[in-house]
């Protein structure tokens, strides 16, 4: 019979166990953050390396090139391989994937998604402690509702001068550590709590449990496995970043070519190791909020997001109270925008009070950098200690 269109499109795919195929196109898309107008090898090579593929346009097609100029056909294919090799030398994405896989003890393919990746991390972590993970009865359960997300403030309308930004470092991992958010530590039953009530000071948390703004409660008697993993990855990342900076400083003053080459290798290795920890830290919440994750829970996910909402809006409250006091204004909103873990603050009124109109911009920028680090950051830190 004549095959249907659907049948003609079907193909057979074989899996060779023990062999992993990594598509550099997928690696590039996953690990770069600037959208390219094209992801063809020729364009990416031009962008990253300043050179592209061999041009065979005079032959019309690869088949014609193959039939009429076989040596050039071979050179064309060799050039493609060399471009991929040079891209890897510069970007190190395969080395990054290898580091991720060895850290989690998983297959290379498992690093492309965070659900399997984090399940493997947790399984091996608990296994080392003699703990068996429970059967995955709820795997693939349907979400009963949309999970509450991060807080994003609508930007204040209009143009704003002298805007500075403050980011809360690794917000979600620190929330997990702060509240001891972990599946085995969550208590059944929720209390009447909300972000709005906590911001307004209409409720007070008492008792032996850590309580998040969504009303979830967590035991504090012992650190949960998820906060412990967050702390481990965070400490390891700090260590690798410190090593990377030390190698970079030494490399800048190094005159010995052999040692400089060795230092470049060490810098790349330290960067990859800290990047692996960063990816793991930033992806933990995403896995936890995924319905296909073995430890998926709406309450756990919302414990993190609502805590993030509370913390970032508390920062907004601290900044506005302080600036209104310093600038002798009343009820003015100086926070022009908020996005998840970032505050964007206009210091235009402060600049106008301190500097005359003709002040060089570089002088104002230096002032804003200094006051941000020496004054505003400590104000935020004291405010969060409440």
Model regions and ranges:
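Catalytic subdomain that performs nucleotidyl-dependent activation
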Residues: 18-26, 34
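Conserved catalytic core of nucleic-acid polymerases
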Residues: 168, 178-182, 190-386
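Common nucleic-acid-contacting/processivity interface regions adjacent to the catalytic cores
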Residues: 60-183, 189, 259-314, 318, ...
């Amino acid at each position: 019979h004549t095959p249907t269109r659907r049948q003609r499109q079907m193909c057979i795919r074989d899996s060779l166990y023990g062999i992993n195929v990594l598509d550099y196109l997928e690696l590039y898309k996953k690990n770069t953050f600037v959208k390219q107008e094209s992801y063809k090898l020729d364009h990416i090579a031009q962008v990253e390396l300043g050179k592209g593929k061999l041009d065979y346009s005079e032959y019309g097609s690869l088949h014609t090139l193959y039939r009429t100029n076989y040596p050039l056909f071979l050179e064309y294919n060799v050039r493609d391989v060399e471009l991929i090799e040079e891209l890897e030398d510069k970007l190190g994405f395969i080395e990054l994937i290898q580091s991720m896989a060895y850290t989690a003890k998983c297959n290379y393919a498992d690093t492309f998604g965070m659900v399997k990746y984090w399940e493997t991390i947790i399984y091996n972590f608990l296994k080392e402690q003699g703990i068996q993970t429970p059967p995955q009865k709820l795997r693939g359960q349907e979400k009963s509702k949309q999970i509450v997300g991060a807080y994003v403030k609508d930007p204040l309308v209009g143009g704003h001068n002298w805007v500075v930004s403050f980011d809360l470092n690794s917000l979600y991992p620190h929330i997990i550590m702060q509240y001891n958010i972990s599946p085995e530590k969550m208590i059944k039953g929720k209390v009447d709590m909300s972000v709005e009530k906590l911001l307004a000071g209409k409720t007070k948390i008492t008792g032996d449990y850590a309580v998040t703004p969504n009303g979830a409660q967590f035991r504090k008697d012992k650190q949960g496995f998820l906060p412990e993993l967050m702390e481990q990855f965070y400490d390891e990342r700090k260590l690798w970043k410190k090593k990377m900076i030390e190698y970079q400083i030494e490399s800048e003053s190094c005159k010995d070519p052999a040692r400089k080459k060795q230092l470049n290798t060490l810098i790349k290795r330290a960067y990859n190791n800290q990047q692996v920890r960063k990816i793991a830290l930033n992806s933990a919440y995403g896995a936890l909020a995924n319905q296909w994750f073995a430890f998926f829970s709406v309450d756990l996910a919302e414990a993190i997001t609502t805590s993030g909402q509370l913390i970032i809006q508390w920062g907004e409250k601290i900044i506005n109270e302080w600036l209104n006091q310093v600038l002798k204004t009343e009820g003015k909103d100086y926070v022009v925008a908020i996005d998840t873990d970032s505050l964007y603050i206009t210091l235009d009124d402060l600049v106008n009070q301190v500097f005359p109109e003709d002040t060089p911009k570089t002088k104002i920028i230096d002032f804003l950098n200094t006051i941000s680090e020496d004054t505003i950051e400590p104000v935020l830190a004291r405010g969060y200690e409440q």
